[in-house]
């Protein structure tokens, strides 16, 4: 058995960025004190989900990497002796911004980063206004707790992203997330959306024989433009094993601080039973790079 203790923080954010960061620091320290070796945070965890509106003033939230936030979280990872997965609004240059996951090693150094590749542009999720498409590619990040396949939110709907991480030796798929209901959706529609979200990532776990970690924010955030009813983030952060089995799923309506133990060696056994990578017809997939096959 190769056990890994994974900590997750499912939090409700406010407009007070300093308070959000203080809550994160407190939560990360608590998880470390409870034995977490790897801690994963939600998408854009320092602030509200500002992409509900297109507002140039929100670019002031972005910061360089390295920068103030990486100093805070790097020092925290070192103090706690953990590997830490964060999600930041990166200012790469004037007018050039990314939605970037930064992974810190136990000594506080940056182990690697991933720039979100799939960028949505839908009502209440106007991310193309803020974020440039990622250009690092789908590259796992090597850490002392394993090779991490870190992706971000909208990436979770694309099996190609998970597969490319798996083909490069990722041992865990990790998804910092910010997703919720449009507040006027019916209860039935809310349930369908939440279950689809969980199911697609559990499918990635099965198809690739890897555990999956998804960490979502929770709580209501109003639409500053008042064009929609705002977003009710549905929480439900979870860990699934390499057969898609749920080890834990958080609640939909409250903050949670979670530790889940997983056995990284299970992937080896599962892939022996279900050798999907062996049986791939790599000679027949060339057309998958087309937008559509007419």
Predicted segments, located by residue:
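A short, polar/charged loop-to-alpha-helix boundary motif
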Residues: 116-130, 254-271
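CN hydrolase (nitrilase-like) catalytic-core segments centered on the catalytic cysteine
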Residues: 62-85, 153-256
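Active-site-proximal beta-strand elements of phosphoester/diester hydrolases
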Residues: 3-13, 20, 100, 113, ...
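Cys-nucleophile CN-hydrolase/nitrilase-fold catalytic domain and related Cys-dependent amidase chemistry
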Residues: 17, 29-106, 110-113, 179-210
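Cysteine/selenocysteine-centered motifs that mediate thiol-based redox chemistry or coordinate metal-sulfur cofactors
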Residues: 138-168, 177, 267-294
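Residue-level detector of high-confidence beta-strand sites
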Residues: 100, 113-115, 249-251, 259
């Amino acid at each position: 058995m190769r056990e890994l203790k994974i900590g997750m923080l499912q939090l409700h954010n406010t407009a007070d960025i300093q308070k959000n960061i203080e809550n994160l620091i407190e939560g990360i320290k608590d998880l470390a004190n409870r034995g977490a070796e790897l801690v994963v945070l939600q998408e854009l965890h320092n602030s509200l989900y500002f992409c509900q509106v297109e507002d140039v003033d929100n670019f002031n939230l972005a910061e360089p990497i390295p920068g103030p936030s990486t100093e805070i979280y790097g020092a925290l990872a070192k103090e706690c002796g953990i590997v830490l997965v964060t999600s930041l609004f990166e200012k790469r240059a004037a007018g050039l911004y990314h939605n970037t996951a930064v992974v810190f090693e136990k000594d506080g150094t940056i182990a690697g980063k991933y720039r979100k590749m799939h960028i949505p542009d839908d009502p209440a999720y106007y991310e193309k206004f803020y974020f440039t498409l990622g250009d690092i590619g789908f590259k796992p990040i090597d850490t002392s707790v394993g090779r991490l396949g870190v992706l971000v939110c909208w990436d979770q709907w694309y099996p190609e992203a998970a597969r490319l991480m798996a083909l490069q030796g990722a041992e865990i798929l990790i998804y910092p997330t910010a997703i919720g209901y449009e507040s006027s959706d019916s209860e039935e529609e809310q349930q369908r959306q939440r279950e689809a979200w969980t199911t697609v990532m559990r499918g990635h776990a099965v198809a690739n024989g890897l555990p999956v970690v998804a960490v979502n924010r929770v709580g209501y955030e109003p639409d500053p433009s008042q064009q929609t009813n705002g977003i009710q983030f549905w929480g439900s952060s979870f860990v699934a094993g390499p057969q898609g089995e749920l080890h834990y799923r958080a609640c939909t309506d409250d903050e949670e601080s979670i530790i889940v133990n997983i056995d990284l060696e299970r992937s080896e056994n599962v892939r022996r039973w279900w050798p999907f990578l062996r049986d791939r017809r790599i000679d027949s997939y060339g057309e998958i790079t087309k937008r559509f096959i007419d």
